[in-house]
Amino acid sequence: MSVKWEKTGKTSGELTFEISQEEVKKGLDQAFKRVKKNLRVPGFRKGHVSRVVFDQFYGEEALYEDALNIVLPEAYAAAVKEAGIDPVGQPQITPVSMDKNKPWEMKATVSVKPEVKLGDYKGIEVPKQSTRVLVKDVDAELNKRREQNAELVLKDGKAAKGDTVTIDYTGTIDGKPFDGGSAQNYSLELGSGTFIPGFEDQLIGHKAGDDVDVVVTFPEDYGAKDLAGKEAHFATKIHEVKSKELPKLDDEFAKDVDDSVESLDELKDKIKKDLKKHKEEDAKDAIQDAAIKGAVENATIDEVPQAMIDEDVQNQLNQYLGNMQRQGIDPQTYFKLTGTTEAQLREQLAKGAAERVKTNLVLEAIVAKEKLDASADEIKQEIKDLAHDYNMDEKVVRRSLSDDMLKHDIAIRKAIDLVADKAKQVAKKATKKSTAKKSTKEDEKKADK
C-alpha cells in the first residue's frame, strides 16, 4: 500500500493512500451482491441479472459508491497504522481517483492527538488534608438525624421558620391562572427553599385560618420561560401550622435510627467511624484533583483539536443521558420539566471539555512513560465491578467493551494513583482571617482519639 502523511498544522494533516485493485474488485463484487436481489432489467426476472448484463445496462461505475463504503474502513485503518499516526474524530476522506484499471487513490484530512511534553508529575505539592473528626461533627450528624425523625405537632401560635404549614394556594399572573400555580392541602416547610424566593417568608408570622396574599416575582432564570421574570399573586389559605418536636437524645433514639446499635454511645462511635471514612475519601479525592491539576499545569501541550473537544462533549452527554435512563427518567420529559434543552446541556458540558481533554492527554503520556498496563486478572475484576455498578450481566459488559478500552481505563487510574501517591502534602497558608479565629475547647477535642 502506498501511504503518504503530510502535516498541515500542529494537530492536523493529510493522509494520502491507495486501495489496491484486488481490494477494489472484492468491494465491487460485494456491492453487486447487495444490489442484485432488487435489480429489475427488462428481459430478466427480478434478482437474476448477471454482472455482465448489469455492467452493460448500468455501467460498473454505478457500484463505485457502495464498493468504496465497503473497502474504505479497512483501507483507512491500514493506512493510519502504516503512517504511525494517532487520529481523533472522524476524518474527511475525498476520492482523488477511482479508475477501474488502477488502484483507487484517497486523500483524508485528519486531526491527530497533540504532542505532550511532560513536566514534573512526581512530588507535586498539594494542600494538606485533615481527616480529623471533631465532637461538633458528631453532634451535627446526631442533630441531623433528630431532625429527620422529628414529629410534627399542631401549633396554635404564629408560623415560624422551620414550621410546616398546610396550605391551599391559587396563583395568577395579570389576574389569570397559570399551569402548575395551584394546589390544595400542600405541606410546606418554611425556610426549606422549596418555593420561589419570597413565598415562604411571607407566610411566617401567620397562623391557621389566615388568608395571605403572597406576591412574588419569578427569577429571570426560572426553568419555565413563560413565567421567568413575571410577578405573580398567590391567594393562600393556611389550614394548620405544625412545629417540629425533636426526639430525646438517648439509647431508645439510637436504637430507633440504627438497628445495628444498642446505645447512644454505640451510635456515636459508629458515626465517628463513618465520618472518618468519608473524610478520608474526600481527602483522597482532593489530593488527586490537586496533584493531577499540577501535573497538567506543568505539562506543555500543543493546541487541542476541536475534534477532541467535540468528542469529549458527546461522551459526557451520552453518559449523562444514559444515567438518566438507567434511573427510569425519560430525557425529553426531564428537559420539558426543567425548561431546558439538550443544546443547553451540551453547552454546559462544553465549558470544561478542553481541560478534561488536556488532563486525559497528560495521563495518557504518564501511562506511556511509566509503561503502565493492565493484567488479565485486573481486566476480569474491572468487568465484575462494572457489571455490579450498572446492574448488568458480566457477559453483556464483556461484549460491549474491548480489551483495549478496559486496559486504557485501568492504566489511567494507575496513573492517577501514581501522581497522587507521589504528591507532597503541605500545610495550607493561614490567612489573617483564619489566624484571628479562636477555637473553642470543644472544637479542639478530637472525637476520633
Curated annotation (Swiss-Prot):
Entry EC no(s): 5.2.1.8
Region entry Disordered, spans: 427-449
GO molecular function: peptidyl-prolyl cis-trans isomerase activity; protein folding chaperone; ribosome binding
Key words, A-Z: Cell cycle, Cell division, Chaperone, Cytoplasm, Isomerase, Rotamase
Composition bias, Basic residues: 427-438
InterPro entries linked to this entry: PPIase_dom_sf (IPR046357), PPIase_FKBP_dom (IPR001179), Trig_fac (IPR005215), Trigger_fac_C (IPR008880), Trigger_fac_C_sf (IPR037041), Trigger_fac_ribosome-bd_bac (IPR008881), Trigger_fac_ribosome-bd_sf (IPR036611), Trigger_fact/SurA_dom_sf (IPR027304)
Basic and acidic residues composition bias: residue spans: 439-449
Catalytic activity, as annotated: [protein]-peptidylproline (omega=180) = [protein]-peptidylproline (omega=0)
A Pfam family annotated for this UniProt entry: Trigger_N
EC primary class: isomerase
Any one of the GO CC terms: cytoplasm
Domain PPIase FKBP-type: 162-247
Any GO BP: chaperone-mediated protein folding
Family assignment from sequence similarity: Belongs to the FKBP-type PPIase family. Tig subfamily.
Function per UniProt: Involved in protein export. Acts as a chaperone by maintaining the newly synthesized protein in an open conformation. Functions as a peptidyl-prolyl cis-trans isomerase.
UniProt remark on domains: Consists of 3 domains; the N-terminus binds the ribosome, the middle domain has PPIase activity, while the C-terminus has intrinsic chaperone activity on its own.
PANTHER family: TRIGGER FACTOR CHAPERONE AND PEPTIDYL-PROLYL CIS/TRANS ISOMERASE, TRIGGER FACTOR-LIKE PROTEIN TIG, CHLOROPLASTIC
This protein's name: Trigger factor
Species assigned in the record: Lactobacillus gasseri (strain ATCC 33323 / DSM 20243 / BCRC 14619 / CIP 102991 / JCM 1131 / KCTC 3163 / NCIMB 11718 / NCTC 13722 / AM63)
Underlying gene: tig
